A protein has these predicted regions:
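C-terminal lobe/hinge of AMP-binding adenylation domains
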Residues: 26-27
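Unchanged
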Residues: 37-124
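Charged phosphate-binding loop/patch that engages nucleotide di/tri-phosphates or the phosphate backbone
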Residues: 122-146
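Acidic, metal-coordinating catalytic segment for phosphate/diphosphate chemistry
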Residues: 1-11
Length: 146
């Protein structure tokens, strides 16, 4: 019988001063910035660190915890359960977003609430849980302009 390794991670649902939401594009899917907690690191601190590393921005504030999600995957034949703690965050800057290429992130982008439909069509079930907790499905989606 295989054992299960539990990994704790944290991430953020970042909103800028225009009310737009921050997403990353990795492995051909839209995602939220998140990552594994370092040894001895608190969940809130880890969430901020991951957002800043993966997106190249400095978070201005961190708010309440949104939710906790779970997903499983296999790594070298071992089953891994990833438990992720999600936090609301704010960003007031106007700096250029910088994807963390070494983590496989190819794009970082702000989305208006009405454009979240584009994310829904190409994301992971656990991210859908976070979006639902943030009540981002309430407005009729507007088509993305190129």
């Amino acid at each position: 019988m295989n054992s299960i390794t539990v990994i704790d991670a944290a991430g953020g649902m970042v909103v800028n001063s225009k009310g737009e939401y921050l997403f990353i594009y990795r492995n051909k899917k839209w995602d939220l910035p998140k990552g594994k907690l370092e040894k001895g690191e608190g969940k809130r601190e880890g969430a901020v660190r991951e957002v800043e590393e993966e997106c190249g921005i400095a978070v201005n504030n961190i708010g309440a915890r949104v939710c906790k999600t779970y997903h499983t995957y296999t790594n070298k034949g071992e089953i891994v359960l990833k438990r992720t703690y999600w936090y609301q965050m704010g960003y007031k800057g106007t700096g250029k977003l910088k994807p963390q290429k070494e983590e496989g992130i190819t794009s970082v982008r702000w989305f208006q609430k009405g454009h979240i439909d584009a994310i829904i069509k190409n994301t992971f079930p656990s991210i859908m849980d976070v979006l639902a907790k943030m009540d981002l499905f309430t407005e009729k989606p507007v088509p993305l302009s190129e």
